[in-house]
Regions:
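Membrane-interface motif at the C-terminal end of an N-terminal transmembrane signal
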Residues: 23-37
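C-terminal, active-site-flanking charged/polar segments
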Residues: 19, 23-26, 44-48
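Conserved mid-sequence domains
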Residues: 161-269
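N-terminal positive-inside, membrane-proximal cytosolic segments immediately preceding the first
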Residues: 1-17, 22
Length: 269
């Protein structure tokens, strides 16, 4: 499991790892409730990432529609749209698996809560015995490879290290002598824990989508902007002046594009 740099994401990952380790000792209602809390946090995080990504996609469309920019921006925008489509497909695929496991464990109550959160048969049957986990693993790998093939070759090596969506093969153990990935993640795992893991995979997909689309946006940022307006600007050398006092100022002519409304931030004190 990859570890993100953001504090909130790091905390979610660490909590998931701790809870998974505790499952090996005891499947208690307290641990299952903790998984439920982590799942809610991951879902909230996923929604925030979607909002961020949508702003990037909107920015691509706006930039492509600017005068004289279409031919230069469109290749980046097309790549971004492909990333979005592939990400949405994987997100839906993982969501479908959640519902399959929940249905296999007994379904939901009227309030939409999972009926049998501690059931360990559904995940084992569907994702291990019926090889659903192998298919899921293949989907994640295919998405990862698509993202790596989207970025420029000179940054691909760094992205191979940084992309959150990745497959980490387990080591051999007494319970998993073949080091089978599906067994490591899904064998005898409670339904609530599996649902949380699938949400974690969705989080990895969303974060990886954001990283690659941001890279495309950075590359598109090198595009030349056509200036269509000019304005005289006076920049005084002092922030205040007394009545009758002479003021020195730097006079310049600024060129800009009326269609561009940049956002400027500062990290200074």
């Amino acid at each position: 499991m990859s570890m993100p740099k953001e504090p909130r994401q790091l905390m979610i990952n660490l909590m998931y790892l701790v809870l998974t380790a505790m499952l090996a000792l005891n499947v208690s209602s307290e641990i299952l409730n903790a998984f439920k809390t982590i799942n809610q946090s991951i879902t909230s995080s996923n929604n925030s990432i979607v909002d961020k990504n949508n702003k990037l996609y909107q920015g691509f469309d706006e930039q492509e529609n600017m005068d004289g920019q279409r031919d230069r921006v469109k290749p980046y925008n097309d790549k971004a749209k492909q990333v979005k489509a592939e990400a949405e497909a994987v997100i839906k695929y993982l969501e479908d698996w959640k519902e399959k496991v929940i249905a296999g464990s007994g379904g939901r109550l009227e309030n939409r809560e999972i009926k049998n959160e501690s059931d360990i048969d559904a995940s084992t049957r569907l994702l291990v015995e019926k090889k659903g986990g192998e298919e899921l693993k293949g989907k994640l790998l295919a998405f990862r490879n698509m993202l790596l093939n989207t970025v420029k070759p000179e940054v691909k090596g760094q992205f191979e290290k940084d992309l959150p969506v990745k497959i980490i093969e387990p080591e051999k153990s007494d319970n998993n002598p073949q080091a089978d990935w599906s067994v490591a993640y899904f064998h005898n795992m409670p339904t609530m824990a599996v649902v949380t893991l699938l949400s974690k995979f969705q989080n990895d997909v969303r974060n990886s989508e954001a990283i690659v689309v941001q890279q495309l946006a950075n590359e598109a940022g090198d595009i030349q902007v056509k200036f269509d307006a000019f304005q005289a600007i006076a920049v005084p050398k002092t922030s205040y002046a007394l009545a009758g006092q002479k003021v020195e100022a730097q006079i310049m002519l600024a060129a800009y594009n009326k269609a561009v409304n940049p956002s400027v931030t500062s990290s200074g004190g």
